[in-house]
């Protein structure tokens, strides 16, 4: 699987991934296993969700027979612990706590910008990308991104390490690096807001 992801990256396609936690077959170390795979594969944008059992699906019917359904799902299985609308095999508090910790680890600046570097180590600018002249708004967007991530953001040192690595080692990948950095920054903001909201919620 790691080789397959690297091959896709080598064709100039950045892989994004969606991952689900909460299956009956998940072992207690599922959080470490997912983190290890995402980091080693260099999947910059990784969306992690908790398993939901939608009504009228085979999963719902099986869990209903087993007496494990708790109610309707929230409708959002990403960054919402209420998505877990059934009794999981792993203890629920253990599952939710591990889920939050996995999100926290994945979107630290060091981890997330490190995955961009890992992705772009194999990256080859595709030949089919249309060449166009640089516009004024391109320059404005780049400087806004550099200001936001390189000056205002906590963990900006990790961003500058990535930036200068790309400038000197993989300059053709700079546009893709900036694109991925912007997406990752959005994920960092959303993840922080989720964890802050959950930590402030009454238990």
PLM regions and their residue ranges:
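A structural motif corresponding to the C-terminal lobe/cap of the Radical SAM core domain
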Residues: 1-138, 142, 149
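Terminal low-complexity segments of carbohydrate-biosynthetic enzymes
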Residues: 121-122, 129-203
